[in-house]
Amino acid sequence: LFFRKKKEINEVRRRIILTKQITDSVITYAKSWHPNEGILILQGKKEKNLIKVTGLIIPPFSTHGPYYSGFPVYELPFDLSYIGTIHSHPSRSNKPSLEDLNHFFGLVSLIICYPYDTEDIAAFDRNGNNMDIEIG
């Protein structure tokens, strides 16, 4: 009873799929808010370990500054297609801060950092673990 074998945990990584159009829109949005942070809501679908981003929403009443961006979640209309957020970091780091993790919304958080290009986008889960991104 006390000496049971521990079950092995098969860690399956979630994968994020972004279209070229979504990626270009995010890059343009981040550049337009520089040197402040910009934030968008991701719309999409989750199928098993695959998260496909199908749209972007500019959050109502969002706030932007050089070290923060956010929005009041209670002002959002109810929509089951919201799967997370993407926001920009005007610095050269696309790692989530403690503040980013504490204000996590949805299944995934994407961060794009300066100079705002495709390879500057990173995805994270609620615990700050990296997720794979596919741009197609």
Q: Where on the chain are the PLM-derived regions?
A:
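Conserved, mostly hydrophobic/aromatic
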Residues: T85
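Conserved beta-strand-loop surface patch within small alpha/beta domains used
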Residues: L1-Y82, P90-G136
